[in-house]
């Protein structure tokens, strides 16, 4: 979210899911929407059937490619060059929204200076996208009435992820596609409450509502509310930095909740070394994950069906969840476990229920001030910002002005993936998810119908590459990077271009993150899961 926060002043989806029904055009980049957000994907397809256009930017031939009017099949990691090329065309042809840019943005001259270097021929050379497709996409996006841009981890899980998001924002502002219904820049979050977790300060630099820990007045407000003194104003560590610190011995203990870094973090052999080097590891989860098996203490938590509270979804909508069944054994709600640990550590917390916690959120978090329990029980949720109990919620952001005032063009230059294929490691591995499984499979691989549909890991390889290497469907192949190797069955398919292979991180039998590169975006701390150099060989 660092890219949107820098350009717009707010790091969240600008518009609402339902607005897809009235969009004229969708620009979809770095999101396999029908597989990873299928309900949103269905809305996009329904809109297409009513006449909307789709521009898809994805190196793989995903399902949405069958519906796309233009498929920009760019080389992995060349998103900035692609977007800069589109903006250069839009500026050169004078089809940007001059009034919007003059009244609502700043730094246009800096943007022009950077994108002018991205001529159609230069961009074609970098991205592999034909000039005609680039021009068609630029003109369609700039001249349509209402265009929604959707993105996800396909552009954020790069060492240049923040640059990618800034450049998406630049394109949307240049064409006036922000601050109106059925427009905007819309990140699709990777889990059902990841937006809510970020909103509540599960980040190293903020309290709830993105109130900076470095701000002394903010700290004083929370000190008064919590009855403590001298809250630390130092920004903490991201996950990747935590693991590096643990490996060096600078971090001695970790408390991990609902996370399985043994499968989900890059270069996972070093993750095991880091966790094993801790003096004390606590894992709070609903199943014995690969990470929980390394813990000194495992605290059994409740699943979504066994607890009450709220979720904040990808469109900033806060919704009430009600307990459906009792938890098994000694499992307890996450918040209740935290309160008990805090009490035993010498700081009693007085929350008696999730209602008490939400009341404190209302008092301390301005964007949630009007999202009360009473209001949530009467409807289908409220979208922040909702500053008071009379406010209806905000379906789309930046209507009259950006959160930061003027939207800032923050031009970026193209940088290649950190690990470029070479003579020894001749393929680029990109990773992601499939329709039937979720993240590290801790939950979905325990569901028989999903295991039936996707029982084993596969690696997608292009038919021409497969023929050259003597690989056929279902042959066992070995993927080798500079960090490790795995064996997996091949799926020969033109979904991937030549010299690219794709696999998922759902399967502990073939932990693909043994291979991935632990470099990360300097602003967001997100690792580069979407591109690392590997060699591929057929097993005997």
Predicted regions and their residues:
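Surface-exposed loop and adjacent secondary-structure segments within mature catalytic domains
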Residues: 201-205
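Long, compositionally biased stretches
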Residues: 374-463, 468-518, 536-540
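Extracellular/periplasmic loop regions
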Residues: 195-198
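Cofactor-pocket helix-loop regions in the catalytic cores of large enzyme subunits
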Residues: 1-193, 212-393, 397, 429, ...
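Long, low-complexity intrinsically disordered regions
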Residues: 521-540
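Acidic, glycine-rich segments within the central catalytic cores of soluble metabolic enzymes
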Residues: 206, 210
């Amino acid at each position: 979210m660092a890219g949107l926060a820098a350009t717009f002043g707010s790091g969240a989806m600008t518009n609402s899911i339902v607005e897809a029904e009235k969009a004229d055009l969708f620009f979809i980049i770095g999101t396999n929407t029908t597989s990873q957000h299928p309900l949103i994907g269905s809305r996009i397809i329904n809109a297409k059937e009513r006449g909307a256009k789709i521009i898809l930017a994805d190196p793989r031939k995903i399902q949405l490619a069958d519906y796309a009017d233009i498929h920009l099949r760019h080389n992995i990691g060349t998103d900035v060059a692609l977007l800069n090329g589109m903006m250069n065309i839009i500026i050169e042809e004078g089809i940007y929204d001059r009034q919007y840019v003059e009244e609502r943005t700043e730094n246009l001259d800096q943007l022009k200076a950077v994108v002018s270097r991205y001529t159609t021929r230069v961009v074609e050379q970098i991205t592999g996208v034909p000039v005609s497709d680039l021009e068609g996409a630029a003109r369609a996006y700039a001249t349509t009435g209402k265009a929604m841009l959707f993105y996800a981890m396909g552009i954020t899980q790069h060492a240049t992820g923040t640059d990618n998001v800034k450049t998406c924002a630049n394109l949307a502002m240049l064409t006036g596609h922000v601050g109106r219904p059925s427009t905007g820049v819309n990140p699709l979050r990777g889990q059902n409450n990841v937006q809510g977790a970020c909103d509540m300060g599960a980040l190293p630099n903020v309290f709830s509502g993105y109130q900076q820990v470095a701000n002394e007045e903010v700290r004083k407000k929370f000190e008064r509310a919590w009855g403590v003194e001298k809250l630390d104003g130092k920004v903490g560590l991201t996950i990747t930095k935590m693991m590096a610190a643990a490996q060096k011995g600078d971090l001695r203990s970790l408390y991990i909740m609902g996370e399985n870094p043994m499968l989900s973090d890059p270069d996972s052999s070093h993750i095991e070394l880091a966790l094993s080097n801790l003096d004390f590891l606590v894992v709070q989860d609903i199943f014995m994950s690969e990470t929980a098996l390394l813990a000194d203490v495992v605290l059994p938590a409740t699943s979504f069906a066994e607890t009450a509270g709220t979720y904040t979804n990808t469109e900033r909508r806060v919704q009430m969840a009600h307990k459906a069944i009792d938890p098994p054994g000694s499992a307890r709600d996450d918040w209740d476990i935290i309160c008990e640990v805090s009490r035993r550590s010498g700081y009693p917390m007085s929350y008696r229920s999730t209602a008490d916690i939400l009341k404190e959120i209302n008092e301390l978090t301005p964007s949630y001030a009007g999202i009360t329990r009473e209001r949530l029980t009467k409807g289908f949720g409220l979208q922040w910002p909702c500053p008071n109990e009379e406010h209806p919620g905000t379906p789309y952001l930046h209507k009259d002005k950006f959160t930061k005032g003027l939207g800032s063009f923050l031009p970026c230059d193209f940088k290649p993936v950190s690990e470029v294929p070479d003579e020894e490691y001749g393929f680029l591995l990109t990773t992601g998810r499939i329709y039937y499984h979720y993240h590290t499979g801790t939950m979905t691989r325990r569901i028989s119908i999903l295991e039936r549909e996707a029982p084993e890991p596969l690696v997608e390889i292009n038919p021409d590459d497969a023929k050259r290497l003597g690989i056929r469907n279902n042959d066992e192949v070995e993927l080798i990077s500079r960090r490790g190797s795995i064996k997996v069955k091949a799926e020969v398919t033109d979904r991937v271009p030549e010299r690219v292979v794709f696999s998922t991180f759902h399967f502990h039998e073939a932990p693909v993150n043994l291979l991935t590169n632990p470099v990360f975006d300097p602003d967001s701390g997100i690792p580069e899961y979407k591109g690392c150099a590997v060699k591929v060989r057929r097993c005997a």
